[in-house]
Amino acid sequence: MFPPLSIRRFTGAALNDYLDAVARLRIEVFRDFPYLYDGNMGYERRYLQTYVKCPQAVVVIAFAGDEVVGASTGIPLQFEEDNFRQPFVAAGFDPREVFYCAESVLRKDYRGHGFGVRFFDEREAHAQALGGFRHYAFCAVVRPPEHPLRPPGYQPLDGFWHKRGYRKVAGLAAQYGWKDIDQPHETSKTLEFWLKSKQPSASDPVSARKSDH
């Protein structure tokens, strides 16, 4: 039986107490397909400092008792790296109106307990409390169906994301590099953006784009 499960939001310096636990969890979970990320604590600590230093950012942490078993990050797109911000600018979006639901990680044993839904709900609620956002977005790495490390029977999360109201936007993608666990060097990856709009109108850039879903 699991210890009591809970979820809490953290902003600013309050995240510091859990920084290393979240960093270790990200390395552990993102090592699996499809990310295959060969991570290290030094990079993860630097990356997570973005969320400590940005007062509008949020990290949602899932606990089993006192143990960190999941984490989900979100930040206004205007404070994200150029790799993620510029594709939106080029597509006609105002980064100040997009809240970026960056990443979610959860230990395998704790999947299927509603944490994935809560991660989206908590980040969107945080964005609503901040105000001024018309869109929520995240991205997912693109891997070929024939990838040698793709597990048998692997199912992407597209169906889950659709249920949360997100749609893949055709042509909206970023390039970002990291080292795969089976590669000697860092390589660039394509990440496709998914978007959820609050009361979209005909003037929204996404309205003129045809999604493949």
Regions found by a protein language model. Name each.
Residues 1-24, 28, 200, 210:
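Conserved N-terminal entry element of GNAT/NAT acetyltransferase domains
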Residues 23-39:
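Helix-loop element at the rim of GNAT/NAT acetyltransferase active sites that forms part
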Residues 36-64, 73:
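Active-site rim helix/loop that mediates acceptor-substrate recognition in acyltransferases
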Residues 68-104, 148-149, 173-187:
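Conserved acyl-donor/pantetheine-binding loop and adjacent beta-alpha core of acyl/acetyltransferases
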Residues 98-101, 120, 127-153:
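Conserved GNAT acetyl-CoA-binding A-motif
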Residues 106, 112-128:
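Conserved acetyl-CoA-binding loop-helix of GNAT-fold acetyltransferases
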Residues 153-159, 164-167, 172-213:
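C-terminal "cap" of GNAT-fold acetyltransferases
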